[in-house]
Amino acid sequence: ETVTPTALVMAVVLPSGHTPPDAQGNTRPNEAEIPSHLLPMVQSLANIPVPTAAPDQAVRIQIPSINVDAPVVQGDGWEQLKKGVGQYIGSANPGHDGNVVLSAHDDVYGEIFRYLDRLVPGDQVIIYTQQRQFVYVVDRTVLVEPTAVEVMASTGSPTVTLISCYPYLINDQRIVVFARLQN
């Protein structure tokens, strides 16, 4: 099996890190969070095309309590997160045993996950595939360092993990929300 560069980078740093927007709203990946020996690889990933979702992969997410309704794209690299919520390649598909890992920005490109910190246990996270919807219920929220990749580990039951930078406009930590399948 060939190791993909994105998977290698994500094995040492969680997705979503970027520099604060400049006066024109431009931003870029936060290279300070990336180990120096992996920096050339990260820079080379900028133009990788976004894969098309298979029928059982996530295509949309809704989180009613924080007014999220956004597309889900495959991959969680810089270019993918410009288009919506990114599903970590290699994570489980919705409804399957394992961990569906989804990430999005909190302060650029739609600020999709800006209000993850407002989620409380019992809130719903609805994930759509081309075939059906899956309702997950929030269990807990934690703050971690960008290198805490263990939050993306596979699980023995159907779960979803939502990841974004935190706090707003500072982004030196990650907020991680865990939810379990309800239906």
Identify what each model region corresponds to.
Residues 1-183:
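Solvent-exposed, non-transmembrane regions of membrane-associated and secreted proteins
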